[in-house]
Amino acid sequence: MAFLDNPTIILAHIRQSHVTSDDTGMCEMVLIDHDVDLEKIHPPSMPGDSGSEIQGSNGETQGYVYAQSVDITSSWDFGIRRRSNTAQRLERLRKERQNQIKCKNIQWKERNSKQSAQELKSLFEKKSLKEKPPISGKQSILSVRLEQCPLQLNNPFNEYSKFDGKGHVGTTATKKIDVYLPLHSSQDRLLPMTVVTMASARVQDLIGLICWQYTSEGREPKLNDNVSAYCLHIAEDDGEVDTDFPPLDSNEPIHKFGFSTLALVEKYSSPGLTSKESLFVRINAAHGFSLIQVDNTKVTMKEILLKAVKRRKGSQKVSGPQYRLEKQSEPNVAVDLDSTLESQSAWEFCQVRENSSRADGVFEEDSQIDIATVQDMLSSHHYKSFKVSMIHRLRFTTDVQLGISGDKVEIDPVTNQKASTKFWIKQKPISIDSDLLCACDLAEEKSPSHAIFKLTYLSNHDYKHLYFESDAATVNEIVLKVNYILESRASTARADYFAQKQRKLNRRTSFSFQKEKKSGQQ
């Protein structure tokens, strides 16, 4: 055992004794603060002195280099073990073997058979590089496109070509629509024109895209340069234009409509438009009537009857009981279905089932309706929105926007940034198909500034009621508009609702009669 009182030697011994056993290198950091104290105790020598060692009183060497251990050299590759020469040589041999595998050795052999000069010449025959005369034949697709280029440059609808989605299928939302063109000849109108449009386009942009593609394909007859002269109607799969519904709103986005078949129809701006639109035939039937629009008086009564039956049955199959037409003024006298409307000299008829008569009291004489009422009934199918308040349970109200059209009723909540919605009911958007509507009645009218109406519809085999409030004028307009739509459609849900309501009324009347009878006997 050795006793040392020199701190310099002790520090050097601790730092250098554990070099091989300490992987962390913490031995070099032992008592590192004492180096500063030693420098203060033993200041460095003057520049004139030679050497860096300090002699103590006992003659022992006092100066040591304490920066790091003597066995560790500081460099950038500290901690990286160098590869030995053997490993480097083995790596070089491995690469040489891989290169030898990639190389293919071919042994040269002398040719035994002798070939003539002519045979050798035939192996490498000289090709003729003379220019061949141009072959006159069918034009290439590029030539045809270049010839059609001036036509495309003169297309007045070029601004709508940016809505063409044929080059964006799979990358951007697009919509494929089959468009029928009634303005074509009788043969061309049977085949639709397929248009691929961007989903973000409006109806007006789609009309312009249809006109652009129509003109680019060189179709005849030529279109009007004004896009506003055309509109889009709903069409059947066979190309028949559905005139029961109004044209699509030109300002609405096309992705809002789920129709895959449309028809491009020209808007009539001539003075004869009013007389053409006012040709309506009224067909009275059980539980309502229908207004059938005709183009002229040359239409046969059979076509009018088929349209009336299809209108009453809606999406159901037309097959079923047979019907006949009778003039409103001549009961029990069947109309010849092969005759024209012009020969009948009447505009009001009755739809009667075969083997039955109007004497049973099924039909009642309705008062003549004026043309203003007819126009109101027709305009009721046009979309119109109203701002009303929806009444919930506990008399809570929510401001909503009520949109009414011929095919559905939409209820969209109106967000109010100022009012706090913490204690209010959060209303979700509701869309009700017109075939599911049952009734719309005025529930309460307290004053001209406050009225309540009830909307009844079928949902999951159950009848639900929604209550709304607004001023009396708005409520009366909504009730009248919805009732016009219900009378013109005559859906099965509405008929079942009134039948169930009548059964409940009869059951209630029968119960009250039995109760009065028992009390009389007592």
Curated annotation (Swiss-Prot):
Region entry Interaction with ATF2, spans: 468-522
Region span, SIN1-type RBD: 279-353
Activity: how regulated: Phosphatidylinositol 3,4,5-trisphosphate (PI(3,4,5)P3) promotes MTOR activation by relieving MAPKAP1/SIN1-mediated inhibition of MTOR that takes place in absence of PI(3,4,5)P3.
Entry binding sites for a 1,2-diacyl-sn-glycero-3-phospho-(1D-myo-inositol-3,4,5-trisphosphate): 393, 428, 464
Main location, first listed in the record: membrane
Stretches for region Interaction with NBN: 2-267
Subunit structure, as described in the record: Component of the mechanistic target of rapamycin complex 2 (mTORC2), consisting in two heterotretramers composed of MTOR, MLST8, RICTOR and MAPKAP1/SIN1. The mTORC2 core complex associates with PRR5/PROTOR1 and/or PRR5L/PROTOR2. Contrary to mTORC1, mTORC2 does not bind to and is not sensitive to FKBP12-rapamycin. Interacts with MAP3K2. Interacts with ATF2. Interacts with MAPK8. Interacts with GTP-bound HRAS and KRAS; inhibiting their activity. Interacts with IFNAR2.
Function: Component of the mechanistic target of rapamycin complex 2 (mTORC2), which transduces signals from growth factors to pathways involved in proliferation, cytoskeletal organization, lipogenesis and anabolic output. In response to growth factors, mTORC2 phosphorylates and activates AGC protein kinase family members, including AKT (AKT1, AKT2 and AKT3), PKC (PRKCA, PRKCB and PRKCE) and SGK1. In contrast to mTORC1, mTORC2 is nutrient-insensitive.
Recorded domain comment: The CRIM domain forms a ubiquitin-like fold with a characteristic acidic loop, which recognizes and binds AGC protein kinase family members substrates. The SIN1-type PH binds phosphatidylinositol 3,4,5-trisphosphate (PI(3,4,5)P3). It plays a dual role in mTORC2: in absence of PI(3,4,5)P3, it binds and inactivates MTOR. PI(3,4,5)P3-binding relieves the inhibition, leading to mTORC2 activation.
Name of the protein described by the UniProt record: Target of rapamycin complex 2 subunit MAPKAP1
